[in-house]
Amino acid sequence: FIEHCQLEDAYGYTPSDFPDAQLNQLELDELLAAIKAKNLEAIYPLSPMQQGMLFHSFYAPESGVYVEQMTLKLKGDVNVAAFKAAWQKVVDRYSILRTLFIWENRPTPLQVVLKQVDLPWNNLDWRSFSTAEQQQQLSQLLTSQKQLGFQFNVAPLMECTLIQLSHDT
């Protein structure tokens, strides 16, 4: 029995692991099956503010009202691997960036914090576009990402896109 419990594949959770969620074993098992994740850190109810934000995100999903976008222009040689690793460390450090939300078939929504998630990362090469085309492409990309929004039941609720504009930007 002890050897089995020490196997990497052996895991299990009970309601006592997540007392704030107020789940029974059946509800916890259903939640685990829904998120297909073994690396749970915590399960919490949503704060009233989070409940309101989730409601408004579903009420008008195309509005992107809670989608924040940040653009930075980096000059010089960028070590892409180090830059990506630094952003991954930010996600690793802050639990809110490893959080997903479960609401379907639930009387009240829950937030689920995972121990580890991989930050979605995109690399784009726009060096062949003119400056005007780059601006147009960026505008279209930001608009489409904002309208697309997020899958709230998949962590993390963020992604990074690194766009190379020239040999040093």
What does each of the following model-derived ranges do?
Residues E3-E27:
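AMP-binding/adenylate-forming catalytic domain of the ANL superfamily
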